[in-house]
């Protein structure tokens, strides 16, 4: 219950303060001291109308109390006990007063409490304050310690804060009763006790709040007119613009953006009178609308705001989870992914609660504008979500985008977005100021119901997928059994499938890693190789089953489900080798049974070991993950990001990028993400545990197929430092031409380093020479740009990034030795089974499902490959074919680095 109340009452304020700090920090380009100043001024200006309304209620209560005081005093003097209570109650009823109204006198304090809690939570542990000096403060994360008397350190700023607070209270309580004065003075000293040893950045913020309160109280005593207040606000914005220009970084290019933003805010403030004049004229021109009725006006506001809250807190999050329920299952503390919706919805309800409170504080005129504004915002949200979805690439199950460069929108797209929003707003306002506005309650009510219906549909889909997941029975009942068997005297074949492993990194890795050079002896790199699709679902069947399972050949078997053909392809080598008496192991098979969480049931029929090693070490992975990314309010990871992702979707295209990337963390966050994503840790842990999973046997032959996704999960430079691999940051910059390539370089380097340790382990146990080792990836990756790629500019007009089509292919044969060799033979990933069975007995050359040899089905004169494929296999269980859109197909022959050998769409170049 306490968590629920915190989420409803406090967390929305925390979000607001956090966002204001994000905006200020973005404005000042990381000058956290100035950001705190702007934060204080900004919050006080934004909250000023709310404070004024609260103080009016407080003043009203004092007037009522003063009017009743003489009679109450007489009653208390004459009557005692129950009789006094009855007489007072009768008197209150006569005056239309209830004792609970006394709480109105506490409204300003009630407003301050959540803002104080939010600011304290954020600024007391903000990483940006550490080692940051500002004005007379050496470190904003520590108490100021400005005065030393002998060995005693005295913090001056809390004392200054208290003095200003007392001065503000003295001005405010002039002519008031002693109890009113005492109340504020006691509160001032309570804050002194609470904040005396707090970070100077936090004390600075609260001191500035008190200064603002003092100035406000002085002007309040002067009884300024609203126009004067408005002029003061404009002057304050002008001053802030000048201060921003002076205190931000000195170069013109660095300060242009903050100054332009502040200037824009000033211009907007200057235009407010004209906007209000337009609104008044519209009200006069269309006087009889639904917004003149208090109840109907509130119903429009409530239904619109509630629709927006449900849309952001339930509809969008449920749609995200429903897109891939298995990825959100058993993750981040959630067993059933439906539990995620509780957090996003309660946070959204909290925002709705505060919006309703604000609405009720204002006069009828302001309520009219707020009601109309709620409808306009809802319309804008729908336009952005459904008409301007954007294509931002892959996103993790913590809702972190993999390639941040894709967040940038073209000016043309953004202009179209803004134009559409403008048109939508204009049409909406025309309706709101016409007689058609009478339909608004019905329209918003229908929208609200439709959002709930959408949530229901998504929830059914999520629950269905979750129940399917719970029924998966992995063939690793002996989970404590070691996953791999390695023969001391027989033959060993290892196939390492590195999901999204990149070919282009091999040379720099060999140049800079001594352990890789020494361990990877006898390897040959096939640089001139090609895959069949951009995604794992379409490429792995051919990798494990050969040419009979290319996307084109799979589509020819149109009377069979894709999932069955996929399972068959992944079963080719296990069935073939196990039936010939080999010891077979297959770990983490890609999308087996079209399940994100490995469903090993298709392997039940074979004599083999099948395990999910990444999940085997899940607990160890979670332990490594849990020590990072904590913040003051405990709402982190998916609990925070889900609602923020919904807000991301609601924003216009280019503002999404600023909202996501503008702060020190993701989604307007002020705390850098310090956790390495769990999928990487699970896959990387499985690599580091390879040697622990080996069971040496004295005789027999062994086939070990090992799928690993470390290369599929690029990590940040900060994560590399966390792993104590700092040298990789500069090494990646030396070879890579963009951040996205650097992030892939990190994980590829780490992968080959761990494989090198495993190969060294095999050598130490005399099992390297009798091993054939194949390292292959299912596909490459778009956006990979490195020094020395002289061929890449030739593909500028290709229409897609050819880098995804070039996979990693390497082999070390039995008894092979020497340095790395390069082979430019034209290869495809479907050659993997041929390489695996090369020079083995004839019975091992045949696909056990078709009866054909791998060699006879080999066809790579012209390779037909797909450069676009729907990758989410959980949505393809009832399909029999991959996409048939001709424009998605590409053709290549002989040399993948020559654009003349490529053709696209319907044109096939011989």
Task: Cite the ranges covered by each PLM segment.
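Helix-loop-helix
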Residues: 1-290
